[in-house]
Regions:
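FAD-binding FR-type
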Residues: 24-25, 46-52
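Conserved active-site region of classical short-chain dehydrogenase/reductase
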Residues: 3, 30, 82, 86
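Short Cys/His-rich zinc-binding micro-motifs
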Residues: 1, 25-26
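Iron-sulfur cluster-binding cysteine motifs and their immediate structural context
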Residues: 4-21, 31-46
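Intrinsic structural disorder
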Residues: 1, 12-14, 126, 148
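Conserved AdoMet/S-adenosylmethionine-binding subsite of the radical SAM
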Residues: 51-54, 58-173
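Non-ligating segments of multi-cofactor redox enzymes
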Residues: 1-3, 60
Length: 173
């Protein structure tokens, strides 16, 4: 690669030798993607307003009503945009639309609590309980995630814990 993305990143989130992006620094500003002549870096998705999102959701209201379903916010990570997601969940609740989020639970509880306060159901992904194994698999320990799982239980959320079993890694073998 040419390295332009690393040189231009205002957060210093792009490693100049590997061109990997440090997601903890990246603000998703798009500078790296907009200046990449080879189109090796691209922005996925688009910005929408709360009203635009609710208009899209309302188009499927009959489906939610007939199926007993609702809106599930996944991603990447639903809590990565916690302010917007919290407002979206509040709007869905005000419109009597059932909501669920999918999360790995990584984030400061003070930041993400509002998301948990305003959703009906949580699909909580636990990659590994053991913090060393979790660090090996994901690059981060499990302490914060387990604490947030505990916080979500105390918060009274309806939770489905999901653990992906990867043969040879976290399947107990």
């Amino acid at each position: 690669g040419c390295g332009k993305c690393a040189a231009l990143c205002p957060q210093g989130a792009v490693d100049a030798s590997t061109f990997d992006v440090d997601r903890s620094k990246c603000t998703r500003c798009g500078v790296c993607a907009s200046k990449c002549y080879a189109n090796a870096k691209k922005m996925a998705g688009r910005k929408v307003t709360l009203r635009e999102m609710m208009d899209l959701i309302e188009k499927d209201r009959i489906f939610y009503t007939n199926s007993g379903g609702g809106v599930t916010i996944g991603g990447g990570e639903s809590t990565a945009q916690h302010e917007f997601v919290e407002e979206l969940l509040k709007a869905c609740r005000a419109s009597h639309i059932h909501t669920a989020i999918e999360t790995c639970g990584y984030g400061k509880w003070d930041d993400i609590k509002g998301v948990f306060d305003n959703t009906d159901q949580v699909f909580f992904d636990l990659k590994a309980i053991d913090t060393r194994l979790h660090r090996d698999l994901t690059g981060a320990g499990s302490e914060l995630i387990l604490k947030n799982a505990e916080n979500a239980v105390r918060n009274g959320n309806e939770i489905v814990f999901r653990i992906p079993l990867v043969p040879g890694y976290n399947d107990g073998r």
